[in-house]
Design a protein with these regions (language model features):
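Membrane-proximal helix-turn-helix segments that form the acceptor-binding/catalytic region
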Residues: 1-14
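A charged, aromatic-enriched C-terminal amphipathic alpha-helix characteristic of glycosyltransferases
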Residues: 184, 197-226
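Carbohydrate-associated surface elements
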Residues: 20, 40
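Active-site donor-binding acidic/aromatic loop of nucleotide-activated sugar
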Residues: 102-105, 116-124, 130
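A conserved mid-protein helix/loop that constitutes part of the nucleotide-sugar donor-binding site
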Residues: 61-84, 94, 101-107
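Aromatic "clamp/platform" in nucleotide-sugar-dependent glycosyltransferases that forms part
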Residues: 142
């Protein structure tokens, strides 16, 4: 905590990638002069790249988790919710991409839930290819700043469910979010997945581009170099 505070007080300007991050920087470390510059995403390019990898669905909905296999990512909750989702969608499939300390534990959980080949642990993957064979991304992190995974998923036109933490509510709509602190988190995730799967095609996504992000950052640097804030 002290190190972060000293670093921030020794800078001429701080940049946060979400309003939530900016608020935390001010509240926890007394940061001054914090400006918001969201992570950018080039929506047409991402959408086109994913469409080039698009694999038509042959069965039920295809759910994707694209994160580290570590406790703060909530993949155990996703497995429990997915096991119940199969009552509505027996042909549903869950791909858990990524690696981490919980790999063996999560695989054992999938076995206990009798999920069989409805779950694939795919390890390290090309995220564009993984999104091309998926219909929905679920991300149940304890904390996020401005998630590139969610930005890319929205740009690609995938359905999304995520925890209402960090910058996630600045990217997603209320019906795509669940309360990470809820005592009924598994059921909340299940209901959110059901609701998203029952909806039609997602609304067009708008966000700042990489070029806009770079321009905003350059503008901040230029003002600092001129001696202004």
């Amino acid at each position: 905590e002290t190190v972060h505070r000293v670093r921030l007080w020794g800078t001429d300007q701080a940049i946060a990638v979400s309003r939530s991050t900016a608020d935390q920087m001010r509240a926890k470390w007394g940061a001054r002069g914090v400006e918001l510059v969201y992570n950018g995403v080039d929506i047409p390019e991402v959408h086109a790249a994913v469409e080039q990898q698009r694999v038509p669905a042959e069965g039920g909905p295809r759910i994707l988790s694209l994160s580290r296999l570590s406790p703060e990512k909530g993949i155990d909750v996703l497995l429990d919710a997915f096991a119940q989702l199969r009552a509505d969608y027996p042909q549903a499939h869950l791909e858990i991409a990524g690696s981490g300390d919980l790999a063996s534990e999560l695989q054992a959980q999938a076995q206990r839930l009798n999920l069989g080949d409805s779950v694939t642990f795919s390890g390290f993957v090309n995220p564009i290819e993984a999104m091309g064979r998926s219909d929905m991304i679920v991300q149940l992190s304890v904390w996020e700043n401005c998630s590139y995974t969610l930005l890319d998923a929205k740009a690609a036109g995938l359905k999304t469910v995520a925890t209402a933490v960090g910058g996630n509510p600045e990217i997603l709509g209320a019906d795509e979010l669940v309360d990470r602190q809820s005592a009924t988190l598994t059921q909340d995730v299940l209901q959110a997945m059901r609701a998203q799967l029952q909806k039609g095609k997602p609304e067009p996504f708008t966000w700042i581009s990489n070029e806009q992000m770079a321009a905003q950052t350059v503008d901040i640097y230029a003002r600092v170099l001129r001696g202004g804030r």
